[in-house]
A protein has these predicted regions:
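AAA+/SF3 P-loop NTPase mechanochemical coupling elements
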Residues: 59-61, 155-192
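Conserved C-terminal "switch" segment of AAA+ ATPases
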Residues: 10-17, 31-32, 83-93, 121, ...
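Pre-Walker A (pre-P-loop) alpha-helix and adjacent loop at the N terminus of AAA/AAA+ ATPase modules
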Residues: 18-61, 277-286
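Conserved AAA+/SF3 P-loop NTPase catalytic/coupling segment centered on the Walker-B
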Residues: 76-77, 109, 120-164, 197-209, ...
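A short helix-loop-helix "switch/interaction" segment in the helical subdomain of ASCE P-loop NTPases
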Residues: 29-33, 66-71, 134, 215, ...
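Short glycine-rich substrate-engagement loop in P-loop NTPases that contacts/grips substrate
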Residues: 92-124
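C-terminal engagement/docking regions of AAA+ P-loop ATPases
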Residues: 3-11, 52-55, 69-78, 267-335
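Walker A/P-loop
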Residues: 54-95
């Protein structure tokens, strides 16, 4: 029997339209700190099909998100999807993620196609492809076809079975699937590599076919300070609720947190800093029957201190020895 594209329609749209994007960049800026220019470009990429028009099962838009590590690429996409779902533009805040490094050789072809179909068939509006640099080149051709042609023919004979794409082999079938389509989803390539690397892997016509290129910037000291304060506020709220005492942080503690990113200038070091701090505060609570009234965080000799009422002391010394070893290893990397 003649093969046909996937027997489905484009993913349903939310009821809201272009007006649902009003003030979106500013709203995202409350979650993704220090990236105002990037957020403007991201909003434009998401808004583009609502201005330019889009119909059918081709990609609603295809774009690249790139930039240094730990600068908000994943966070911004998640925050945008959730906010657009809340506003009624998207039907779901979910995102489908595909790690292309899981398919390094031709032997993973069936797995790749099955996973790709599941990602395209999921209820979210966005499909993100990561680590294209480590993917089998033949599979990148499939993605290139989805972006440039709106569909990608399947070389083998496949059928849908219980919602999954299955190789039909030599079996006699009447409903073979002949091609994959983007189903009206946003297709996003996410990478730390520059645009030139994308052209090397996919070719210049593919890059030209992308609707937008959104690039994050390395976080400035001011941005890292803002991240440090925002993450501390989360820690303080969590400690008040779970540990039963108030936590404050002086300027020295906040500066130490902001500088914990090291040379990478990403937010991950700051997040890890406050994660260790919370673990140490929790350890103090575990070791004492009565909760202190408050804990005041400070810094001395490059170490985070806490004053529970008897004077400042090294907070991270409360961590179990194995965990302290991990802390020292992280510090050595940052130095």
């Amino acid at each position: 029997a003649a093969a046909a594209p996937l027997p489905n329609h484009a993913a349903p749209r939310g009821k809201a339209g272009l007006e649902g994007f009003d003030g979106l960049a500013e709203a995202l800026g409350g979650t993704v700190l220090g990236q105002p220019d990037y957020l403007q470009k991201l909003v434009i990429a998401l808004k583009r099909p609502y201005v330019m028009g889009h119909e059918g099962e081709s990609a609603r838009n295809a774009f690249l998100v790139t930039g240094p590590a730990d600068t908000g690429k994943h966070l911004s996409l998640c925050a945008a999807a959730e906010e657009l779902a809340r506003r009624g533009v998207f039907v779901s805040g979910d995102i489908s993620w595909m790690d292309l490094s899981l398919y390094p050789t031709a032997a993973e072809e069936k797995l790749f196609l099955q996973d790709l179909y599941m990602a395209l068939a999921a209820k979210g509006d966005i499909v993100v492809f990561e680590h294209y640099e480590r993917c089998q080149p033949a599979f990148l051709t499939v993605l290139s076809n989805l972006v440039q042609r709106g569909k990608s023919p399947l070389a083998g004979r496949y059928v849908l079975q219980n919602g999954r794409l299955v190789d039909a082999g030599n079996a006699l079938v009447t409903d073979a699937v002949g091609a994959l389509t983007p189903r009206g989803k946003y297709l996003v390539l996410l990478s730390e590599a520059p645009v030139a690397k994308l052209a090397d892997s996919f070719g210049a016509p593919f890059v030209s076919a992308l609707g937008d290129i959104c690039e994050t910037a390395a976080l400035t000291p001011e941005s890292l300070s803002a991240v440090a304060k925002a993450e501390f506020d989360k820690l303080a709220a969590r400690a008040q609720k779970a540990l039963g005492f108030t936590v404050t942080a002086g300027d020295a503690a906040l500066l130490l947190a902001a500088e914990s990113s090291g040379r990478a200038k990403g937010a991950q070091g700051v997040l890890a800093f406050w994660d260790r701090a919370y673990r140490a505060l929790a350890q103090y609570r575990l070791e004492h029957d009565d909760a202190p009234k408050a804990a005041a965080l400070g810094a001395a000799d490059g170490r985070l201190t806490a004053d529970f009422g008897a004077g400042p002391a090294d907070l991270l010394s409360l961590l179990p020895e194995a965990y302290q070893g991990e802390v020292e290893a992280v510090k050595a990397e940052l130095d």
